[in-house]
Structure formats: structure tokens, C-alpha cells
């Protein structure tokens, strides 16, 4: 069976109550990735825009089915459970790592 890999382009971004946009996706292995951009997130630009197309980078976090942070499992040198200013290629690489776990 061929496994279809989920990538950035497959994320469903929605407007957030506080402004900006965000997407969450839970993979078959139970890991969830959150990709957010707004004036409150580590994104470029740091503004409340209405489309993911308007952002060059995003804030990313990952957790398992128990709600435990797993960001550092995939990015060992991350200084935090949240990764700032991740571009589409970096997010695609993270998403592929998650799906290979």
C-alpha cells in the first residue's frame, strides 16, 4: 500500500478568534502539529492577516495523543516546545519526520 504523505499544502487554515490564521492536523500515529501565524505568534509578518498565503513563516508546535509536547523529539536542539519562524520547507520536513516515526 502506498502511503500518501501529508504536507503543508494539505493543512486547512482557518481564521482565529484573536486574529491571524491557524491549522492543526493529527497524524495516524497520534501526533498533532499546530501551525499558527498572527501578531501574537513567531511568524513573518507578525500581523493579523487572513490567509496563510500572506505569511512567509509560522509558529509550529507538536504534541502526542496524551497532550505531551514532542517538538524536541523531532528537533533536538530546539530551545522550546514551540518553534518560531518556520518556513514551508521546514514545516514540510517536520511533517515528513512525524509521519516516518
Regions found by a protein language model. Give the residues of each.
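Catalytic phosphate/metal-binding cores of nucleic-acid and nucleotide-processing enzymes, i.e., regions
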Residues: 4-101
Amino acid at each position: 500500500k502506498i502511503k500518501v504523505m501529508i504536507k503543508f499544502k494539505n493543512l486547512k487554515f482557518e481564521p482565529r478568534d484573536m486574529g491571524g490564521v491557524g491549522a492543526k492536523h493529527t497524524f495516524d500515529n497520534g501526533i498533532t502539529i499546530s501551525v499558527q501565524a498572527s501578531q501574537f505568534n513567531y511568524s513573518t509578518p507578525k500581523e493579523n492577516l487572513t490567509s496563510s498565503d500572506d505569511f512567509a513563516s509560522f509558529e509550529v508546535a507538536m504534541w502526542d495523543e496524551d497532550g505531551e509536547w514532542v517538538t524536541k523529539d523531532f528537533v533536538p536542539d530546539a530551545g522550546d516546545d514551540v518553534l518560531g519562524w518556520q518556513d514551508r520547507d521546514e514545516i514540510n520536513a517536520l511533517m515528513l519526520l512525524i509521519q516516518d516515526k
